[in-house]
Amino acid sequence: MSGISAQLVKKLRDLTDAGMMDCKKALVEVAGDLQKAIDFLREKGLSKAAKKADRIAAEGVVALEVAPDFKSAMMVEINSETDFVAKNEGFKELVKKTLETIKAHNIHTPEELLKSPLDNKPFEEYLHSQIAVIGENILVRKIAHLKAPSSHIINGYAHSNARVGVLIGIKYNNEKNAPKVVELARNIAMHAAAMKPQVLDCKDFSLDFVKKETLALIAEIEKDNEEAKRLGKPLKNIPTFGSRIELSDEVLAHQKKAFENELKEQGKPEKIWDKIVPGKMERFIADNTLIDQRLTLLGQFYVMDDKKTIAQVVADCSKEWDDDLKITEYVRFELGEGIEKKAENFAEEVALQMK
């Protein structure tokens, strides 16, 4: 296998669900570099990400608390080794005390939490005592603690299974709209819990990330088109770009000119171009911002009205309520996200946290 071990091929297959021979070929191409092999398979349209959720997991809870005046909110991810322990009354009490300590000492990170006092001793000692009593490693892995300035509210949503939580902050101008803004924030938080946007806005992406994702996206669409062609179905447009951050004024002006030249060649009278070109530009932007539509909160289509993006929903509410709304905060925790469900890895993370 050209120096590529069977174990490495199996690991790549577990991570991507690609075929065994495809995994072997990818590893040979990149001299055994696992991350490069994953990227290679994605760019070839051979990686199936659907299994990811089954592989990356840890037990415990995501818990949040929103202040009654919607001016502050806390969210925490606490991991245990088994879901059985996560349902234990002692574990539930630990979650309660964690939130109380975060609130009392204005804590924003797990490191700050461990050093903070609880019942006249460091929280770290309390956590060690609970680990001894409960009999499993327990890790306070993530903390979000948001506070709203004037003319802002914060609301959130925690899924009933305690595995997903979201906090949303919205700025507004008209105080009479506060109750409606609170409800809107909760509805958007529910959307985010289900649809898993990675970031708030495309501006949060790096250009390198967008270029890499665009290559994978093009490979995916080309593969879908092969199947569509075989079945006699309409083909999807192949994008040139993936995100709005790539669509500069120059790019848009060039595309507008291309559409005008196209209409001229078709013999369409110039006086009707302004009725045709805007629709073509809208379609061009939609086809070339697919990464935003998949991965950004503002770019996703709203689950309660799939004809509108979240950005359009916020804009429509601004117009309807005579206000100027803006989503300013977005935090989403999903239990175990980024942790492989392997005891040794979890133990290492706990050990690092306890140092």
Curated annotation (Swiss-Prot):
CC terms in the record's Gene Ontology section: cytoplasm
An example molecular function term from Gene Ontology annotations: translation elongation factor activity
InterPro entries with a match to the protein in the record: EF-Ts_dimer_sf (IPR036402), Transl_elong_EFTs/EF1B (IPR001816), Transl_elong_EFTs/EF1B_dimer (IPR014039), Transl_elong_Ts_CS (IPR018101), UBA-like_sf (IPR009060)
Cell compartment(s), UniProt: Cytoplasm
Keyword DNA repair annotated: no
Keywords: Cytoplasm, Elongation factor, Protein biosynthesis
CDD domains: UBA_EF-Ts
PANTHER family recorded: ELONGATION FACTOR TS, ELONGATION FACTOR TS, MITOCHONDRIAL
NCBIfam families, sorted: tsf (TIGR00116)
Function comment: Associates with the EF-Tu.GDP complex and induces the exchange of GDP to GTP. It remains bound to the aminoacyl-tRNA.EF-Tu.GTP complex up to the GTP hydrolysis stage on the ribosome.
Family: Belongs to the EF-Ts family.
Protein's recorded name: Elongation factor Ts
Organism classification: Bacteria, Pseudomonadati, Campylobacterota, Epsilonproteobacteria, Campylobacterales
